[in-house]
UniProtKB/Swiss-Prot annotation:
Species assigned in the record: Nitrobacter hamburgensis (strain DSM 10229 / NCIMB 13809 / X14)
Disulfide bond annotation, renumbered to this chain: none
Keyword Cytoplasm among UniProt keywords: yes
Name under which the protein is recorded: Nucleoside triphosphate pyrophosphatase
EC number: 3.6.1.9
Cofactor: a divalent metal cation
Gene3D superfamilies hit by this protein: 3.90.950.10
Amino acid sequence: MAVWREPKPLILASQSRVRQALLANAGLSFEAIPAAIDERAIQRSCGLTSGAEIAVRLACEKARYVSLRSPGRYVIGADQTLECDGRLFNKPDGRVGAAEHLRALSGRTHALHAAVAIVRDGRQLFEYVSVARMTMRELSEDTIEAYLNAAGDEVTASVGAYQLENLGVHLFSRVEGDHFSILGLPLLPLLAFLRSQGLLSL
């Protein structure tokens, strides 16, 4: 059952299969159009140092980029950032980078910020950011090697080199935060906003 009331579907400015699945499972009609932006260049030039603020900025920029090329459409942008011991992590560069990420996060608690924004005709209508506290268990070199062998290259698409919805769940001893946000999309606040605008039938 589709609950989206507008004649034209939403646009998700992301190629993330997990975010697409979350929207589809919630009954939202949408199409995915990834934003062709340089995330690291924006991050360097924006002058922001907080992981939460950077996540919001990137979510907004993704949505704005696609919105300006899609008149009249509601566009969702989303982003995640990870902070651990004062260090801001980017998506790992290949398997070697993923292993380095996991070594740095092993035995520590990190903050995972998930942001979502909605833009229409270049105008930002909504933004939200949440934080989850993720405690990774102590990982041996053998465990890291075995995990990367089993999980494959897909882990490099995640800022923390793990996917909690898959084998990444084995890496953690404690997780505190909203499940949807950890997967990459603060879904409940997003749905609440769309509902408040009369855009959903439920």
